[in-house]
Amino acid sequence: MIKKFKKIVIKIGSNSIVDPKLKTIKSKWLEKLCKDIALIHKTTKIVVVCSGAIALGSKSISRSALRKLEDKQAAASIGQIELAYQWRTKLKKYKIKVSQILLTLEDSETRRRFLNARNTISSLQNRNIIPIINENDTVATEEIKYGDNDKLAARVAQMIGADLLILL
């Protein structure tokens, strides 16, 4: 049934991909998801919006320190590289290349930046590369944050003209 869609955005929440106690990737869960993505990717353009950078990075920063914005941003910078590595490693098994795109609210509200982001995603998809998108939490301040990646995923779906948005 999903194969009838031409463009799909899959949004993955922190609790789906990161073990909340261990602050590590749920590796087996991600492997199963990547297998499904590989099957769908044969006939459908896919974009993944993935949360979890702060949750992953918080393992390296004391929990009490995560009260300040700059500490959450530091955790995001630590966790984001792990997220990208996991996606790259898991999808490489299926000969699928991935890219990383980090967006802020301004990237979808400023016309020039919106078009640039859309064109970048389109260019990647035309090369059968799956963009893995997250909010750029290392630079986003409270005033310019999406708030959560559900909103970011909806905006990306609208940006690329997706036929389906899946929230996990």
Per-range role (PLM):
Residues 1-168:
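Nucleotide/pyrophosphate-binding catalytic subdomain
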